[in-house]
């Protein structure tokens, strides 16, 4: 068994004061989330976990079930943090210095081919898919295959969470897109 650290974003509750945060924290702790730390930023609820499990996927999926089964709240996990990252966040996750990642991005190091941003590409703070950066670094011998697999699993989990969210929301019921 290993301990996995991750953060879940909760989408259907607004935390407007300390009492709201305390109430939901107590309910989570009384449930199966004694390994969680709860925080609120701009009224959004985030839950940090240090979850023991056989695999990263088991840790995350059980945490999602535990959060969503808390009595008295209809909490819904909308995403796991970390699939889209800045270079600084990618540096934290991979253990490669941000300055080195910036040189890889510019092609100064690494021979080129660094992944392109997937969001805010023309902005000051673009976002990359962590799995793309992890895979590129793995090909260069800079990170482990386990790190790449974890980044990929975050992509898959978030895709499933987003699909569930859209499927259960009437706003999207009549929209069909062919790609």
Predicted feature locations:
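Polyanion-binding surface elements
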Residues: 81-104
């Amino acid at each position: 068994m290993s301990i996995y650290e991750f953060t879940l974003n909760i989408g259907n509750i607004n935390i407007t004061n300390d009492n709201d945060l305390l109430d939901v924290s107590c309910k989570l702790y009384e449930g199966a989330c004694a390994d969680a730390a709860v925080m609120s930023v701009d009224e959004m609820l985030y839950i940090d976990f240090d979850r023991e499990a056989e695999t990263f996927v088991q840790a995350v999926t059980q945490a999602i079930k535990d959060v969503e089964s808390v009595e008295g709240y209809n909490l819904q996990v909308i995403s796991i943090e970390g699939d889209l990252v800045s270079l600084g966040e990618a540096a934290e996750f991979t253990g490669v210095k941000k300055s080195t990642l910036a040189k890889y991005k510019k092609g100064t190091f690494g021979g080129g081919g660094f992944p392109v941003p997937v969001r805010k590409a023309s902005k000051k703070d673009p976002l990359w898919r962590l799995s793309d950066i992890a895979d590129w670094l793995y090909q260069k011998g800079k990170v482990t295959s386990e790190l790449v697999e974890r980044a990929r699993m975050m992509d898959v989990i978030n895709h499933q969470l987003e699909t569930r969210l859209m499927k259960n929301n009437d706003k999207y019921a009549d929209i069909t897109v062919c790609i």
